[in-house]
């Protein structure tokens, strides 16, 4: 859990914004959304594999775009 210290004469809104930003960097909200409902291990593996394939295709597309720009 991210902890922030409220500075002297710091408005509440600014402290809240800093706390939200630290939570976002720590990945707490995405973790909570991921754990909200039970996910079967097969579904979890399927989702992980699909994201790996998506990353790979994006990487290939970037490399192809770079290669096409060079010539």
UniProtKB/Swiss-Prot annotation:
| Species name | Baumannia cicadellinicola subsp. Homalodisca coagulata
Tell me which UniProt keywords the record has, alphabetically: Ribonucleoprotein, Ribosomal protein
Name of protein: Small ribosomal subunit protein bS21
Specify whether Ribosomal protein is a keyword of the entry: yes
UniProt-listed NCBIfam families: S21p (TIGR00030)
Cross-referenced Gene3D superfamilies: Ribosomal protein S8
Q: Which GO terms describe its cellular component?
A: ribonucleoprotein complex; ribosome
Q: Which GO terms describe its molecular function?
A: structural constituent of ribosome
Q: Which domain of life is it from?
A: Bacteria
Q: Which family does it belong to?
A: Belongs to the bacterial ribosomal protein bS21 family.
InterPro entries linked to this entry: Ribosomal_bS21 (IPR001911), Ribosomal_bS21_CS (IPR018278), Ribosomal_bS21_sf (IPR038380)
One GO term of the biological process aspect = translation
């Amino acid at each position: 859990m991210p902890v922030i210290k409220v500075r002297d004469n710091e408005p509440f809104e600014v402290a809240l914004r800093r706390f939200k930003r630290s939570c976002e960097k720590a990945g707490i909200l995405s973790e909570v959304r991921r754990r909200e409902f039970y996910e079967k291990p097969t579904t979890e593996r399927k989702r992980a594999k699909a994201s790996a394939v998506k990353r790979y295709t994006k990487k290939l597309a970037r490399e192809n775009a770079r290669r096409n720009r060079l010539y």
